[in-house]
Amino acid sequence: MKVSRVLALVLGAVIPAHAAFSWKNVKLGGGGGFVPGIIFHPKTKGVAYARTDIGGLYRLNADDSWTAVTDGIADNAGWHNWGIDAVALDPQDDQKVYAAVGMYTNSWDPSNGAIIRSSDRGATWSFTNLPFKVGGNMPGRGAGERLAVDPANSNIIYFGARSGNGLWKSTDGGVTFSKVSSFTATGTYIPDPSDSNGYNSDKQGLMWVTFDSTSSTTGGATSRIFVGTADNITASVYVSTNAGSTWSAVPGQPGKYFPHKAKLQPAEKALYLTYSDGTGPYDGTLGSVWRYDIAGGTWKDITPVSGSDLYFGFGGLGLDLQKPGTLVVASLNSWWPDAQLFRSTDSGTTWSPIWAWASYPTETYYYSISTPKAPWIKNNFIDVTSESPSDGLIKRLGWMIESLEIDPTDSNHWLYGTGMTIFGGHDLTNWDTRHNVSIQSLADGIEEFSVQDLASAPGGSELLAAVGDDNGFTFASRNDLGTSPQTVWATPTWATSTSVDYAGNSVKSVVRVGNTAGTQQVAISSDGGATWSIDYAADTSMNGGTVAYSADGDTILWSTASSGVQRSQFQGSFASVSSLPAGAVIASDKKTNSVFYAGSGSTFYVSKDTGSSFTRGPKLGSAGTIRDIAAHPTTAGTLYVSTDVGIFRSTDSGTTFGQVSTALTNTYQIALGVGSGSNWNLYAFGTGPSGARLYASGDSGASWTDIQGSQGFGSIDSTKVAGSGSTAGQVYVGTNGRGVFYAQGTVGGGTGGTSSSTKQSSSSTSSASSSTTLRSSVVSTTRASTVTSSRTSSAAGPTGSGVAGHYAQCGGIGWTGPTQCVAPYVCQKQNDYYYQCV
């Protein structure tokens, strides 16, 4: 890397500078994805965390909103750190929080997982790397918690691993972990052994760890510990009564199902457990709820319903620690007609449902429900007449309810996670007095959307966001970005919209495509995405892919992987474009209606007959893969092409190309947005001197500026980017699990190297014995989770004299300029060749 930088300096290439862009979320609102785990601190009021499967960890605020605390650890290399498979709090220290991070245990995630720890409620994190993978987005992710801190000894932490890796223990507060050789159960259940991609063919492993705080201590550690495993054949619940020295299956335990949750009610000296016939989070057709009397060693089946009323398993389990014997359990999954919640105030002897049949198909609701912080949830998922023509009913209460918690300091405060949001409220005890509670969406601040595409039309809608699971959203102006929309893209409403585009000469004309099989997956808007209509010319066999709209809005080009590239003009029938390969990258010239562009492999294509046919264009240097094409929003014939070797530019509709710079290579999504004056900024995710991240150029790619800073966006090959077509210097980034971010700033010419957050982690060493120890490095290591990271000045400073301004170069090999910074900034080393005033 040093060699390439030296060559760049010798050749006079401009290396990116760092610009101070402050990132925040566009408020889609309401969560937008699965929340498999919620945990309250057992003693301190107001301390709680919610874990997501692809969007990281959040901390609860006093106003019921949430703050993301893992953004700073999810850069391109650490994208999998947004998969949170378990979370634990220290009962003796409300500042400490631990999490198991990693996205997949199959080949989709090449990296092993880690246990991260924070002593400041998630402001900074230290890492201990594990010698195996962690599956925050794998089957069984709603079980838990797999991570637990000994209530009698903060140094002792247990982690139940997946994939047959067993039980792990730390005795130094999470700095190192060793395998517990005395615990031999591994949780051998595999959902689908025939699954060749490994997602459903991995062992589910251990499901939870629960300490019995009422037991005595052995050597300063809690003596009784329960562990649940994914095993419905031999035994699934194990116990140690000597602080983990030996383990045995709990006698008399129920078989047949998998234990999803196990929670202790200390006042009763009882363990409550929910069971389902699958490991979740999508399955569940039978299940049960049990109470284990620890002192008596007896089990009692307290399942709320039986017979034909029992067609689901059980997942979420909340105990009221203020009121012994009071608990709430949730169905997993009652896909029809709705989820069901049950509450008991007598240790499960009797139960009260949250809804019941009046006379079919009418339901009697013992609750009210509202979503004021995310209106689209109520408008599109609750207050609708039909979810599907076959049943006419909707799922108001949610689905995939694996996390359900009652605040241990407040019997009225409860939360539960669904596949879309967090519901809950502050009057739970009304269930007992009036048999009616008020439920709200309480996920404000959680932005877990998987963004599929972004667009911003000059003079049109400020932001069009196509998302997974929740279809998409329109923000008419920049003033709307902080307010959750009233509605998702509706009529038609799909689960996922994969692509959206606008017509350059008619910016209120918008087209989108979806990936739901069996129905038309093209929708058209003539009012900038406020309302939509189905394009009935689309064949119901086609779905997914990307879409491009001609400049005048009369021609749709649709590139799919399974049906090839299709073309429709004047909303007529779609016809195959034989001159393009399936799945080709496509774009329209935004000013010339007859011109479209495409790329596949290393070949660039151009059409001058509204996409009817394409011809091969010039070779783009040594590029082997064309990844994206961005046409200039206001200049005909000007376009940029992103490739595995960098970005190429044409000003003659693709007749000739030139590479804009060699400073940025291996680029992915690119976009143009209004810059300062009459300039347009070019934004690109690619690899530069600061690594793989988001860069911007104010001079058509001649120089580049790092505008990402310490904000994590996940892997750059899955991020989306759109420059604002109307707001100078504003740029949008779509992530796979953290929604849409935006920032605004001035992008000038690059004058030096870029600053980037330094990320360090504990290294792991595995011993040859059966007890594998993971050791941290000698120096304590942390990562900032906030947008602005802490930086430490290097001891080896630059040489020279003078005073440099904010973000200016102040040192480096060969530097002869100023070495002091204007107050209050300090000169910090970014690399051997570049020091910067930050």
Swiss-Prot record:
EC number: 3.2.1.155
Active site: 53, 469
InterPro entries the UniProt entry points to: CBD_sf, Cellulose-bd_dom_fun, WD40/YVTN_repeat-like_dom_sf, Xyloglucanase_GH74
Transmembrane segments: none
Catalytic reaction annotation: Hydrolysis of (1->4)-D-glucosidic linkages in xyloglucans so as to successively remove oligosaccharides from the newly-formed chain end after endo-initiation on a polymer molecule
Activity vs pH: Optimum pH is 5.3.
Alphabetized SUPFAM superfamilies for the sequence: Cellulose-binding domain, Oligoxyloglucan reducing end-specific cellobiohydrolase
Function: Hydrolyzes the glucosidic bonds of unbranched Glc residues in tamarind seed xyloglucan, producing XXXG, XLXG, XXLG and XLLG. Has a low activity against beta-glucan and carboxymethylcellulose. Not active against Avicel, laminarin, xylan, galactomannan, linear and branched arabinans, galactan, polygalacturonic acid, starch, beta-D-Glcp, beta-D-cellobiose, beta-D-Galp, beta-D-Xylp, alpha-D-Xylp, alpha-L-Araf and alpha-L-Arap.
The protein, known as: Xyloglucanase
Taxonomic lineage: Eukaryota, Fungi, Dikarya, Ascomycota, Pezizomycotina
